Each structure stands twice: as structure tokens, then as C-alpha cells.
Amino acid sequence: MNPSGFYVDPLSAIAYDTVYNDLSSSERKEIAEGLKRLALDPCLGDWVLEPARIHSLNSMGHNWWTSCACMGGILALSLQNELPEAKQGAEAVYEALPQWFDFAGDVLQQKPKSFDADGGMYESLNYANFGIQEALQFRLAWMNTHLGQKPVQIPQLDKLSDFFVHVCYPRTGILYNMNFGDSHKNVTAESTLMLLYAMGIRNDNMLWYMNQVEQGQHRDGYFIDRPMGFLYTPDLSKAPQLPEIKKSQLFADFGWATMRTSWEKDATMLAVKSGHTWNHSHADANSFIIFHKGVDIIKDAGNCWYPNPSYRNYFFSKRGTQCRAFQWQRTVA
């Protein structure tokens, strides 16, 4: 299945559930069988189920397994009343999900493990939030269809909120974030935090973070005027003025660090990246950002968005890594 095709599965699940009560038993079965053949089988067949599976947790970037497998899992949950095979598929995704969080990396490809011991996923804030969000959408859907059944524990979930708080920069105006790799400083992670909160994984720092995000500040947010935001935005009236968390953090497993003068808005913050490069965390090692008085006065020199020709022509090369460029020049000389 083409990665862009995985969105067919959750959209089909929503459409099927919407009209489910208006369909006859035969219509439900006919539509379910068609969705299984055209959407579910290609997705779970490629990513999860034997003997058709051609992908692994190591395929593509760290975020793609959940983006594809978990969206297929949502469709499987929608079809499970009519099709025993769909129920089996949903269970297969559910049982495999903790392995994605536990992925230990690949030495041969110099690919680090997905999650740092102190929380967070290194493949840029944008894609960390995306991959985790897709995983949690499925996990929450599974919990909603298995009421009273305790979900399998995933230890990494307990540290995610600290990661997202540490890499944000509160300011007058929209909330900024570290934009190392393929990300933007206006991208935020309220969607992941809302899903965690809905699952019962809660703390006051989450409320503080969500309260800093302005409605509509980025493309994929869970805002109050969108279905997921409408459903899962918690009561933010009890959000604290400041988070209860330390002012510096080292993510040693993937080479990020942050430190700041205060958690008040428009303070001074230093963010440093010096670690692995892979996929969305591309070759901009030894980068740093300084935020001061609400502005990134020193920007990440390695940040470059897809349409820019330099994205492939420069940042995919060794010269795109500052420390390697120095060594390369010296070798040539």
C-alpha cells in the first residue's frame, strides 16, 4: 500500500460507523467485505499480518509504522462486528503496538532507538507528534471498544508530556517549539496530550501546555472547532500559570538538550541538537537555537522545508552537517 493511501482506512471507518445504524445486516456485511478487500487487507497485509507482510518496525522513518498499521487498526475495529478477520487484525495491531515504542534501533543503518529514556522521539517534534498521535488514536479507539478491559501498559507514555513541555517556548503570541529537523516552530503537540489525557494519563503540566496553544496556530491541531478538539479538549480553566518542571533537560539518547532562564513567557531559552541523523531528523547535527524576548534570535541553520531545492541538494549531503563539512574540507586540502 502506498503510504499516502493509509488515510483511506480511518476515513472509511468514520463513514462506515456514521451510517451503520441505518444499514440492514446484509448491507453492513457487503460494505464491510468490500472495505476489507480494498482497504484493510492491503494495509494490514503490508504492515502487520503474515504471510503477506513486507514491512517491519524498521521500515522508512520511525513514524510510518503507526501511521499505516494503526490507521488500518482503526478500520479493523470498525468492521469487527461483521468480520472475525477484522477483529483478529485489530488484535494483531494492538499486540504489536508496544513493540513500536520499544524499538531499539538498527546498528547497521545507524538508526537510533525510537524513544529516549527521558521521553520523547527524536525525529523532529512535527513527526514525533504525528507518529505518536496515530498510535494513540488507535489505542484510544481500542479502549473505547473494549470498555472495562485494562489496556496493555506502555511505559513511554508516562514521559511524553515532559518531553513536549521541555521543547516548547512560551511567549507572547503563539506557542513556539524547537524546530530541529523537518518541523516548524509553530507546530505543537496538543493532539498527543489530549489523547493521553483522555486515556487517564494526566498531569497539570499538560493543561498548562494545551492552554498555551492558540486556536488554529498550525495545520493539524486538535482545535476546539474541529471534531477531535471538540471531543477531547479538557477543562483548561484549572491550568496552572506555570509548569512544575525543571528549567533544563538533556535527552542523551538522541542528543537534544534545552535550558532556559525561566518558564515565564518571553524568557531566554537555548536548544541544542548534536546527535543521530535519520529521515526527518536530517543532517543538521551540531545545530542550536536561541529564543529571547519571544523571538528566535539565532535560528537552526539546518532547518529547511521540502519545496526548497537545498533540502535534497544540500541537506542530504555530508556537507549539510557542519562538523563533517569541516572534516571534508580539511581532507580535500
Which ranges hold each PLM region?
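Aromatic-lined, polymer-binding surfaces characteristic
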Residues: 1-162
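Extended polysaccharide-engagement surfaces of secreted carbohydrate-active enzymes
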Residues: 122-333
